[in-house]
Amino acid sequence: MKHLAQAINESMNKSKVFVVLKPGFLNLAQTVIERFAQDGWTVSQTTTKKLLLAEAHTLYKVHRKEDFYKDLCEYMCSDICRAFIFEKSNILDPFKEVKKIKEEIREKYGESDMRNVLHSSDSQKAMDNEASVFFNCW
């Protein structure tokens, strides 16, 4: 019985984050997974999808007033993306930790401000909105 209680407690203490591998970078999927794994993150869900323009608008609605918004949305629809839900137990600020990993990957593999390998949610509210674009049951 102790094992069941421990498993329930551990599952309740898991933080989840949403990450999207942008068009043109699907070849880095394993690299991204391995980098997250180095810090104790595991993939709980993943999917690939070619976004519709309306979905890209949903994904980046916080940037709708920015000059780059139209180009960013068009770029995100240009080819297949791969989305991930990563999870990790017992972490205080998952979005801060993931931002550090994201910036490291962008620095190493990014080609420009827009073609910067991946996007990650910066809050629970953003994650709920963004993950729903890729995962039906979110």
Where are these regions (language model features)?
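Non-catalytic terminal and connector segments of soluble metabolic enzymes
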Residues: 1-138
